[in-house]
Amino acid sequence: ETLGTQRGWWVQNVGLDRPVPEPGATFQLEGPRGSYLGAVPLHQGGIVDLPNGDWWGFSMMDFRSVGRTTALSPVTWKDGWPYFGLPGNLGRTPRTWTKPAVAAEVAPRAPYQRSDDFSGPALLPVWQWNHNPVESKWSLTEKPGALRLHTLPASQFLWARNSITQRAIGPVSTATADLDATGLQPGDTAGLALLNMPFASIGIMRTDAGFILRWYDQLSNETIEKPLSLSRVFLRATGDYDNDVAQLSYSTDGKNFTDVGGEIRLPYQLKTFQGTRYALFAFNTRGREGGRADFESFRVDEPMADRSQNVPLGKVVTLTNFANDSVVWANPHGMLHSAQRGSEEAEGPGARFRVHDRGQGRVALEVMDGSGYLTVVGVGLSADVRPLNQESADSLFMWQDMLRDRQCMLLSLKTQRFIGIDPATGAPYSADWVGTHPDRKDGTVLVWQETESELVPPQVLLR
């Protein structure tokens, strides 16, 4: 099960048995290959039971440059064996499902506070050290309201002791660090890095002649240096982790940022399995202890964190199949079919659907030509997805948010499988698809678009 996630860019020659790559190392990268799986699917985990008798599975999954994450799956027992998946779709995990039935009332919230102004008595739980830290060489109290890192000798960033990190959060995010480098001594360097193998960084280096801005990309082994007249800068990393790329930039006022260097490639590697991490660092390249760097703040912005608008509840939408760009259409023969984009059918009310909220992620889709609610009949074969005048339990779908570009899937609660088409045959929609491929081009992934006009007044239908 890949949940529709491709294997991204991959480092082939950095693994557990390989040394830590030094500057100038050659990295052998491989790009995405359609629906090739590799080690992306759910793997390595276990199962747990709840007091009410439900079972759930947890497992790892490699989400491109975000790294290895944890997935939760409903578990079904059959013939004495546990299967990830629902009774009607063993072996496949829905991307969205009702949460485990636990006694506690838990409101939705972010698991971590990622931004830190370093004003508290301790580091926030989201932070992790890249190496065992030297306790006497970092402080939150020497300069109240700042994280102070004293520089220790290191030949390069990957060996720096007091580097503090947190996971880069996807699908996209921006990390901004406010660095006061006044306390750096010659040979010191401090800044913000994308911790990976290869890594990339942007920061301030103190030379015998003064301060310079230094940008480095280990993949290309390219360095960019610019003289600085100030010792305080804002450093920024903007990452698109679905596409394995990032951009580094800097600012002297915290408002106007200037990109430095080109686009950074963020591959996944099997040395740490962690993908890309944001890191604050300070070390000395001359083989001695040096000065200090003060990080005044660290802020993470997640423009896609609010998913509430990704399910168009109460809205009228069109649905387009991601595989072949055909428009989902309830045809006059009473079945869900496809219409060519721009055609009379695609522009008509039979290709408009009102999304009704039925709670817990469930929706009912009302066809705006007055023919009824999309309902799965029979066993969900081709032409078994039909508009019926009366809504029933067989009209319920679990909306699957695919996180990007208004992509979604519809899981029938009757068959516990997805609606879809075979893009090569032109057959009507069915509700017997087990899931999608990593490239999402198998006919099960849809793209919704809100429409401004309903074309005809919605009719009162029996429920």
What are these regions (language model features)?
Residues 308-463:
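Lectin-like carbohydrate-binding module/patch detector with strong preference for beta-trefoil
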Residues 1-313, 350-352, 394-396:
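Carbohydrate-active catalytic/glycan-binding domains of CAZyme proteins
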